[in-house]
Amino acid sequence: MPHSFPDYSFTCPFCKNNCKLSFAQCPAFCPFCGKSQKNESTGLPIQSDFYQIIKSIGKGGMGEVFLAYDPCYERQIAIKKIRSDLLEHPQIKKRFLKEAHMTSQLTHPAIIPIYTIRSDADTAYYTMPFVEGDTLKQIIRKTKLQEKNGETLDYLGGSILALMRVFITICQAVAYAHSKGVLHRDLKPENIIIGKYGEVLILDWGLAKFIDQSPEEELLASFPESLTKQKDITKIGKVVGTVAYMAPERALGQPATIQTDIYSLGVILYQLLTLKSPFKRGTLDEFRKNMSREEWQDPVTAAPYREVPRMLASFTEKCLSLDLQNRYQSVEELIRDIENYLEGRSEWFCIANLNTKEKNDWEFQENVLIAEHVAITRMTDDAEWVSLMISKQSFTGNTKIEADVCLGEQGHGIGFLLSVPEASAREHLIEGYCLWLGSDFSKTTKLLRSNVEVVHAPDIFLKRQQTYHVRIEKVDKSIHVYINDNLQFSYIAHIPLIGTHVGLLSRDADFEISPLEIYVGNLNINVNCLAVPDAFLAHRDYNQALSEYRRIAYSFPDRTEGREALFRAGLTFLEQAKTAENKMPLLEEALNEFEKLHGTPSAPLEYLGKALAYESINDSEEEIKCYELAYRRYPNHPILPMLQEQIISRLHEVSRMQRITTYRFTLLTVRHLPLNKIDTHTKRLFNSLQKHWEVLPFIEYKSPSPLTTLSTRFATPLAFWLAKPFILGEILDDLIQSPPFPIEEVNNALLCLVELGSWEYAQEKLNTIQTYLNLPQNPKWLDLKAFIACHYQTLEDVYKDFFFQIPSTNADHLHAVLYFMDQCLDQLNTSLIYTLARQFEHAELSFEDRLRLNCRRVWAYLLDKNWQDAGNLLYTYSVETLNKDSSLLHFLYGCWLQVTEGAEIANVHFAGVNPVMFPRTWTLGARFLTNNLSKDSYEKAFMWEKRQLCKQLILYYHCVGNETKRIHFQKLYQEQFIHAEL
């Protein structure tokens, strides 16, 4: 034992005085206080080994529980000792000690802990805390008597809500024991004690067993005849447990399971609700005989004055179901239902059945083509036909959808729609939420919000040719998805959707589905203070909603609800502005409301709100600035996931119609959102963007790393297309901090700066890199210096300094050569172009590189109006190549035809360009000259595209001799540069 006292040591449990005795026996009276040292009821001596027994507090079949004093720790404890007449029976003793050992392995606040265990030839006992209080049985009995006598009810027994808090603690302890593989097998109110200070403890684990434990012996070899007559000892080999709390299948000899413990919990729950047992049972044999005649009485009718909630009555009935399939499968399921009750949620009411075969149930029932990312693609390669059905009836508040689904052999899945807006408010076909349940053929289960993936769950799928019960619950801002009554995942929506319709979506017809059962549960006992103004907002009562939001914000300035109310007050103005003739005053009011969140713990909501305000007036640039400010000022704020969800949603939304805005949101996403939070749906959008954008000729990647890694390789061209030199500067700063030094990425970012016109900024960045990193000279730096030198030296000097001594066979510096040639064309210095062309005449160039070099030569000939040499060089290529709009020579050949063959032939040639939504830059001039490029298209073009168009038209009008238009486009050309400086 961990502590020991000699036999002659004595401590009085009453006055706590200690002395040493010259004899081993406990004295009859304390020599200090004079109190008797014998138990008045049993006459037993107070001293027991190392503890002083004070009194007996309970008896059972195998043992007795005493209140005792532990002198080592100076505390009162409870000792459970085996009956002395049972010590001689090894199996009884073993069973007694098994309870102690099994309980000691369970560590839970609601399971009584074990202090010590002792067993020898003379005794067997274990110690545990002494808890002052009443058993649940005593509380039920006392409350029932008070009710009968018309007295004031016990504070606990008289409150079903308080009893449910106790019950859920019991359930949590049992669930914990089950998780450790232990069954209690004797759950009943007398084994549960409620402490003086609210402690809830499950006692008496004497019948507990491990779930996977082998069956006990059927018979006890030497079971004494004297014990067989004692009813208070459960016989080994017999069905163990208390009949009143025993599951029917257990009484019939089936082994104990988790569901038999759940049945016992159901009986306890029934007693807590009604103060009476659900069934009258006698002995085990009588129970077996009368089992089929037991009648269920609903707790609501069994105790009409207790006002038993129907929800709790239904939980009780499910616990006590004779059909194991209908009984709770785990205690966790019961806990979830009890928690729903404690949170005040009402029960669901079925108000509609929507049959896919009944046309009158559906407002919209068509096959539609869903195309994604149209704003950034040249063809609808991300499009598919789907069958779409939207309910005619609307469902407000909390909504639940239930249906049985069976996918066929070729079925890919089924989609459930909810929170779909009214037809007049739908900007796109699929709005609201869509739960797509994929089959085992595709495994693409996901939850989408306005066609944007917010949950990706590939491990959840429906096996083909099997029927599943699907349940979707939308409660407040949460969506819970169940399959066969098992929760699969939950999702919390940060920005509410107000839609009230439901629907179905399918990619094929290979499925069977039962009519959709639609439930609503609008009432909630514990109403969130925001629910009231939310309801006003949903019904467009803006003034009342605003008044309530402001009142909540004023009342709870330091709580999340108060700050959320400020945010929603701003949203109220935005909703009101949607239908107002004069929006601007309302938008100003919204911005003022969002401004109040500045400096609070919910500060990012200020920028989210302002972004929503700018979105409402289609000012995407200011909208994105708000998101950038939020991420820059609060990079690790816990509210940022709300902004992230909105950013991703907006990215997919604008990808349908707005190309430049899509690029802006993509750059924002790549630069600020965590890479591991980018979902597969968004990555697919990035892949589509990369596939369809024009490859910039001055960006070079020799390593195989793909752009879709969302690294700077993706951000750099995005920043260039959007003409964002300072973001390129930030990218460079990030690259410098990324060892090993990524020379290729740094060079590309610097070249982008030069091409934008920010060559001074590029020079300063290059100087910083070389000064602080002390890098060795690199051939790429030489090319970059040549790029920059074109802007502050004469072209002749640049040629002498950088290109004069380049070996004629060396093509490594071709990028710099081509850039230098472009500068010569801009300054009409064609002689240097001819010189460089001769210098590289015998260089080993690829077909594409030779083509780009020859394009500059043809351009120079056309500037010099040297039609002969221009034609000779053009006709070194086939007519088929010259007529292809995919060739860089296409526009140059058209200019040559204009001056040599006439306008009619040239127009036919220019008109041969393919009609695509976003043409390549080298076809822009041809489209403009054939009136296939609108002024609106020009306004929506990127700066680089405008520059290339102007450059082509400068050449064309130079060739035809229209000096006025040439000068006009020359001025426009000069405007397409950004001269950023540090």
Swiss-Prot record:
ATP binds at residues 57-65, 80. Together with the serine/threonine kinase Pkn1, may play a role in the specific interactions with host proteins during intracellular growth. The active site is at residue 186. This is Serine/threonine-protein kinase PknD. It is an enzyme of class 2 (transferase). It catalyses: L-seryl-[protein] + ATP = O-phospho-L-seryl-[protein] + ADP + H(+); L-threonyl-[protein] + ATP = O-phospho-L-threonyl-[protein] + ADP + H(+). Keywords: ATP-binding, Kinase, Nucleotide-binding, Phosphoprotein, Serine/threonine-protein kinase, Transferase. GO terms for molecular function: ATP binding; protein serine kinase activity; protein serine/threonine kinase activity. Residues 51-342 form the Protein kinase domain. InterPro entries: Kinase-like_dom_sf, Prot_kinase_dom, Protein_kinase_ATP_BS, Ser/Thr_kinase_AS, Ser/Thr_kinase_PknD, TPR-like_helical_dom_sf. Its EC number is 2.7.11.1. Belongs to the protein kinase superfamily. Ser/Thr protein kinase family. Pfam families: Pkinase. Autophosphorylated on serine and threonine residues. It comes from the Bacteria.
